[in-house]
């Protein structure tokens, strides 16, 4: 079961936060919300669709941080919760000067943007 204000899907709990933070602060905020909490990670297109169903009505057409980043500058993107990057939403990773991945609230299109940008975000933890 998920706490009040959190939504349940496939054994995880999710919550949209209508405040903007940079990637690092948002990830830290998520870890402080619940044990095992992180910025959202996607393991399937169904999970991504579920998150879109949460974010789109609240945030309309904007971006949310995901837990995906290359903050260690290792030329390898990783989820902040340590899960496998098996689902990529057909995303072609072009390595740029930016390191953090945000997701479009309307359609889950990913974009690599500067980690210092202020964006809304979704936290997730295992129920």
Swiss-Prot record:
Q: Which Pfam families match?
A: Lectin_C (PF00059)
C-type lectin domain residues: 9-124
Keyword terms of this UniProt record: Blood coagulation cascade inhibiting toxin, Disulfide bond, Hemostasis impairing toxin, Platelet aggregation inhibiting toxin, Secreted, Toxin
Q: In which tissues is it expressed?
A: Expressed by the venom gland.
Whether DNA-binding counts among this entry's keywords is: no
Record's keyword annotation contains Secreted: yes
GO MF assignments? toxin activity
Q: Which domain of life is it from?
A: Eukaryota
Its GO CC terms are: extracellular region
Q: Where in the cell is it found?
A: Secreted
PROSITE patterns per record: C_TYPE_LECTIN_2
Cystine links in this protein are 2-13, 30-123, 100-115
The annotated subunit structure for this chain is:
Heterodimer of subunits alpha and beta; disulfide-linked.
- Function as written in the Swiss-Prot or TrEMBL entry: Thrombin and prothrombin (F2) inhibitor. The IC(50) of thrombin-induced platelet aggregation and fibrinocoagulation is 62 and 35 nM, respectively. Its inhibitory activity is at least 10-fold lower than that observed for other thrombin inhibitors.
Q: Which family does it belong to?
A: Belongs to the snaclec family.
Q: Which PANTHER family match?
A: MANNOSE, PHOSPHOLIPASE, LECTIN RECEPTOR RELATED
- Record protein name field: Snaclec bothroinsularin subunit beta
**What organism is the protein native to?**
Bothrops insularis
